[in-house]
């Protein structure tokens, strides 16, 4: 008898500290990619963390990082790799290699957290489709309506 262990995809959820909007996140990430290219360091979009996720293999099975912006999960990015790097002070870090494409999600309120949290597939919000993106309310209005229980 053979037993097959199927590893499920796990996602990361993290606060985008200091980020005001999805556009702000996009601009900052683009700036970082350009700066790294100019300095000849690399041409990838990376996000540095102190620790490598223990569930690395599950995250790398099509996992994403879901960004909390202003109290809501609003957007995600596919994690395409993880690399060990050395920081400026010689500290070992983990570079999450991200797909630059930001995919808007259904707004999902989330409490503040430190670091990241793992989330199963069922616990993360669905992506918005093109029609939903085009017809969606401005995020500030949608937030207000949600807080009032009207959405």
In which residue ranges do the predicted regions lie?
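Short, extreme N-terminal leader segments that mark the start of a protein/domain
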Residues: 2-29
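A generic structural signal for short beta-strands and their flanking turns/coil linkers
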Residues: 11, 61, 92-94
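Short, solvent-exposed amphipathic alpha-helical segments in soluble enzyme
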Residues: 30-31, 83
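Short, well-structured hydrophobic secondary-structure segments
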Residues: 33-76
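Aromatic- and Lys/Arg-enriched surface recognition patch
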Residues: 77-125
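Well-ordered alpha/beta subsegment
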Residues: 114-151
């Amino acid at each position: 008898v053979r037993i097959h262990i199927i590893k499920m995809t796990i996602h990361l959820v993290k606060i985008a500290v200091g980020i005001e909007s999805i556009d702000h996140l996009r601009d900052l990430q683009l700036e970082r990619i350009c700066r790294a290219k100019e300095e000849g360091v690399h041409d990838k979009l990376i996000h540095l963390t102190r620790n490598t996720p223990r569930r690395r293999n599950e995250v790398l099975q099509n996992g994403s990082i879901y960004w909390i912006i202003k109290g809501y999960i609003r957007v995600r990015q596919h994690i395409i790799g993880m690399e060990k790097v050395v920081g400026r002070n010689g500290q070992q870090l983990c570079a999450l290699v991200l797909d630059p494409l930001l995919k808007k999600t259904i707004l999902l309120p989330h409490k503040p957290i430190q670091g990241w949290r793992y989330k199963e597939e069922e616990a993360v919000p669905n992506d918005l489709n093109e029609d939903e993106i085009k017809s969606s309310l401005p995020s500030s209005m949608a937030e207000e309506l949600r807080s009032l229980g009207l959405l």
